[in-house]
Design a protein with these regions (language model features):
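Canonical positions in the second alpha-helix
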Residues: 25-26, 60
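Active-site scaffold of zinc-dependent metalloenzymes
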Residues: 119-160
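Residue register within tetratricopeptide repeats
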Residues: 17-18, 51
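TPR/TPR-like (Sel1-like) alpha-helical repeat modules
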Residues: 42-69
Length: 161
């Protein structure tokens, strides 16, 4: 099995340390593979290796223009972007979110991933007596190369709910 594929499978199953080893091996074996570096960046974030993650994302971005370096913001700034996006939604979308508690979390937990949440999910909704929509900051940042792109993606994520 291809190392990148193995890393993806481990990552999706919530076996982050196994995924990290496979992704590192894939990058060692094919140092010009932008997808391997991008995957290593995502996995490294999940295991708490922010500096290694940033380095992997920079390497991936240097290999392909289709992957800009993720735009990072503080937790407070991201919360502000979520609030601004919520307030700017069309009336119908705002009404859909009125009874929903919005929660910001850095990433899905390993337990969330093992329970079926995609590790790269932008949001997760838990239904019940009190509906909660969790917005994952890092996964939004990973797909955004600027604050404008981040703002747009957050608004799009909220409007889909």
């Amino acid at each position: 099995m291809d190392l990148v594929q193995r890393a993806r499978e481990q990552y999706s199953a919530g076996r982050m340390h196994d995924a990290l080893e496979a992704a590192q091996a894939a990058c060692d074996r094919a140092p010009k593979d932008a997808e391997a570096w991008w995957l290593l960046g995502r996995i490294s974030r999940h295991v708490g290796l922010a500096a290694a993650s940033d380095d992997a994302f920079r390497r991936a971005s240097a290999l392909t223009r289709s992957r800009p370096v993720p735009y990072r913001v503080s937790a407070g700034r991201f919360q502000q972007l979520v609030q601004e996006a919520r307030e700017s939604l069309p009336p119908a979308a705002r009404r859909r979110l009125e009874k929903v508690t919005l929660r910001v979390q850095a990433l899905p937990s390993v337990d969330d991933v093992r329970g079926g949440v995609e590790p790269d999910a932008l949001t997760a909704r838990s239904r019940g007596p009190h509906e909660v929509l969790t917005v994952f900051q890092v996964n939004h940042e990973n797909r955004s190369g600027s604050e404008t792109a981040l703002r747009t993606l957050v608004a799009r994520s909220l409007s889909r709910r």
